Amino acid sequence: MDVPVTNMLTAAEEALNQTFLSDGYLVVPVENQAGLDRIRDCVAELAASHLKIDLPNDRQAFLDGLHQHVDVPGLNDMRLAVINGMNQQPWLRATYFSLVRSVLDQVVGNELVMQRRINLSIQLPEDSSSLLPVHADTWSGDSPFEVVVWLPLVDCFNSKSMY
């Protein structure tokens, strides 16, 4: 007896999957705003500590204006200090995953592996040396079957973005 195949996805889920397949990326809101705030605050605290400045109350404004506190020659040292500090936080990886868990589950399934260390990229205004090419880990030998979650910690717009 033939059993009819039915689509188990809602129309919204199907549309999200089709967008991912056609565009190769998705822009979605985070699922855990408190987790995003905690990660952002952690990054701000680590950056201020490395720069030896008092952490302002408005951590979002601090990160949005970080270029006022660090120059291009000092950028990589600060970035590495923040990365090391982030990866020492036992809660951070699980919190990062919680930001997009259901979208990842829908798009790629639940049999996932997460890289061991969280990374960080920072671009300063008018700094062409820190701009990234189109991101494709397959060129460096990573699997073409991976999904990269990029989480902006600042307000991104036309000239204030990754590309």
Task: Specify the residue positions occupied by each region the protein language model found.
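N-terminal auxiliary "cap/dimerization" subdomain that precedes the catalytic jelly-roll/cupin core
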Residues: 1-107, 111
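Hydrophobic alpha-helical segments and helix pairs
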Residues: 93-136
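Short, solvent-exposed loop/turn segments at secondary-structure junctions
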Residues: 32-35, 120-127, 139, 155-156
